[in-house]
Amino acid sequence: MDNKRKLLKIITIGDRMVGKLSIIKNYMGRPFFQWGNSIPFDFHFKEIIIDNETVSLQLWNTHGSAYEDSKIYYRDVDCCVVCFNIHNEQSFNNLIYWIKELEANTLVDEKVPFVLIGTKSDIERTEKSISKERIEQWCKQIEDQGIVKEKIHYFETSAKLSTNIIEAYETIVKIALNQYKNKQKNSINISIEPEKPKGIFQIMIFMGVVFYF
């Protein structure tokens, strides 16, 4: 059993005021509040037990706009939470921008897994709200384009009523832990390379003998 404490980095992206900080605060066990704009980015720590091992979560949040140090925010991410307001058309249309932002700030050969979250489900849907059918179509389109490695997990949440917050983060953490383990495995495979055989000249020097040809 690996006794090393695992630290998972989970970032949250999406437009301003869609409720990103509220769902993080809810998951942290803090009461719902109508939060204003946060600083460019902040992070929170939480320890949980999953599969009989303690895991440390580092939950990062950004206020929803580009900034100079975005590379820091996206570095070494294990899972990304992409949020939109199910009653806000623009936040839904901007999802593709955030997906491209994620791709642009991570390694070329690395596809960071993400979970899609629709916020403010406590408010009744109207004709201007984003229908579940449109959301399913969007997910299928992203999957068909090969932007993600696996099927997209989608949750509709309410920080106000604590709806689906725990369920969403259970999935997020499992995905992040799997990504973490895969990265560790790949890192070990890269570092363990067969030693190249020494040339004749190197062997002779090691033996204290030098021949000139």
Curated annotation (Swiss-Prot):
Q: Name one GO cellular component term.
A: phagocytic vesicle
Give one GO molecular function term.
Answer: GTP binding
User: Which Gene3D superfamilies does the entry mention?
Assistant: P-loop containing nucleotide triphosphate hydrolases (3.40.50.300)
A Pfam family found in this protein is: Ras
In which domain of life is the source organism classified? Eukaryota
| Positions with a binding annotation for GTP | 14-21, 61-65, 119-122
Q: Which SUPFAM superfamilies match?
A: P-loop containing nucleoside triphosphate hydrolases
Which biological process terms from the Gene Ontology are attached to this UniProt entry? phagosome-lysosome fusion
The record's family statement is: Belongs to the small GTPase superfamily. Rab family.
**Designated name of the protein:** Ras-related protein RabK1
Naturally occurring in which organism (per UniProt): Dictyostelium discoideum
